[in-house]
Amino acid sequence: MRSVQNQNFTDIEIIIIDDGSMDNSIKVIKELMKEDNRIKLIRNIENRGTLYSKTRGILNSKGKYVMTLDHDDLYARNNVFSILFNEAEKYNLDLLGFASNICSVETKYLNRENYISYLKTFIIKKPNIKKRFLNHNIKQSGTLLCMYFIKKSLFLKVINLLGKEFINRNIDAHDDTILMFLLSRNALSLKHLKDIFHVIFIWPKKYSISLSFHHTIKFKERERKNCYSFLTFSEILLLFTENNKNDKKIASNHFIQWYFKIGKCHYKKDIIKDTVRICNLYLNNKYIAKSSKNEILSYLQCLKN
């Protein structure tokens, strides 16, 4: 929070979304609000997920541009907002990306070699934006929402495209991928900077996963939400790619690569129904590669067994 408050570009609003927290977060936020009238608190009555919370924050914002920041990350410099605002205005940008460093919470050490970035500064304009996004591995840096300065009008267009049906799902993972996929597909101009403006903190397992029964159950629930969120992204990926052979083939490849080969919890009984539904959506896509089709059919047979 201090890294936001201490920015030398002061004409900002700071919107904090409380997604049904059970700790003393509200108390801390209210103390901050007493000292800084730019802070606005929005509370979800119950946990609604990160996709819903982020879109709610955007809908309640007033500025021309928006950024998101996870609760445990920070900005690396106090002139980040001023640099990004001036660049976006100068080039009339819809999206402006930048680099992020990765820091271990245990060591507090920032390794300049351990960062997420494109290696050079460049500007691209439509139609090359959507081509770039689909053709690189969409798990990588291009999908981190916190690494972009975004024109609000573009974000509102994406929210409208998603509609209440998707936004109201309790999506608690892959929300950045969903949003960046649609933002990239609808942006008219994008610039990437190689400057490191953002720090991502990595928490060791002993802080995030407890061996206690209670926390083991919570972790399993997290796994379930993660798989359900990816299924939603897979559905969106297929729905919003262009109706041509190349794009649909790429969408299918991403689905296969992520869900079958990386997702370890897709046999959970409560999401099998959704898994089968999404698999059938891909099977009914006439542009799906034969190898992908065979892999999905084989997978569905395993589920039946």
Residue ranges and their predicted role:
Residues 241-246:
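Flexible helix-coil transition and linker loops at the boundaries of alpha-helical arrays
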Residues 1-231, 240, 293, 304:
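Nucleotide-sugar donor-binding/catalytic module of glycosyltransferases
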Residues 233-234, 279:
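Non-transmembrane amphipathic alpha-helical segments
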Residues 90, 249-305:
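Membrane-interface aromatic/basic loop that binds lipid-linked glycans or pyrophosphate carriers
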